[in-house]
């Protein structure tokens, strides 16, 4: 199943946002990221987790300090909210998958807070690839060849 051009751009923008955020993260931003992460990791409510996941990615986009990147990612998140919510539900049902994604978020947040731009970009790429893998699994199970990666 091929990904659309928009999906490639979104992945690149997410990676660029992580890289820029690592260079711009203030102490307040670090506290906010850790707070969102703690809420995400402690919540067992899937709807709350989906909202917190979105909040984390949105916060990274804001910290990046590039309005164009933030606005494009925010618009994409609005358009793909249903797909992401379904993907998170699928991840929660799979053994250890939620733990894997939580660990990716944790490592990403720490790279951003520590200012490691290259590591933040790499970890965001890996995170996006993981989410894409789950979206493709869902599509294969449902026999839908039109579902493509969005986040």
Model regions: which residues?
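Glycine-rich loops and low-complexity Gly/Arg-rich segments
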Residues: 76, 96-98, 147
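Long, positively charged, glycine-interspersed low-complexity recognition regions
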Residues: 139-151
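Alpha-helix initiation/capping motif
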Residues: 6, 49, 94-98
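Extended hydrophobic/aromatic segments used for targeting, binding, or gating
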Residues: 83-98
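Conserved amphipathic alpha-helical segments that form helical-bundle/coiled-coil interaction surfaces
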Residues: 10-86, 104-111, 119-133, 138
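Single conserved hydrophobic/aromatic residue that forms the stacking wall/gate
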Residues: 1-5, 9
């Amino acid at each position: 199943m091929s990904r659309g051009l928009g999906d490639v751009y979104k992945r690149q923008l997410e990676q660029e946002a992580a890289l820029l955020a690592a260079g711009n993260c203030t102490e307040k931003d670090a506290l906010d990221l850790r707070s969102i992460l703690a809420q995400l990791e402690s919540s067992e409510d899937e709807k709350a987790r989906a909202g917190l996941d979105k909040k984390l990615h949105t916060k990274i986009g804001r910290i990046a300090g590039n309005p164009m990147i933030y606005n494009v990612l925010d618009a994409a998140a609005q358009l793909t909210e249903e797909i992401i919510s379904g993907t998170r539900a699928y991840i929660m049902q799979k053994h250890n998958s939620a733990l894997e994604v939580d660990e990716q978020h944790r490592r990403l947040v720490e790279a951003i807070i520590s200012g490691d731009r290259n590591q933040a970009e790499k970890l965001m790429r890996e995170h996006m690839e993981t989410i894409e893998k789950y979206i493709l699994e869902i599509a294969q199970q449902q026999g839908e060849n039109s579902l493509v990666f969005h986040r």
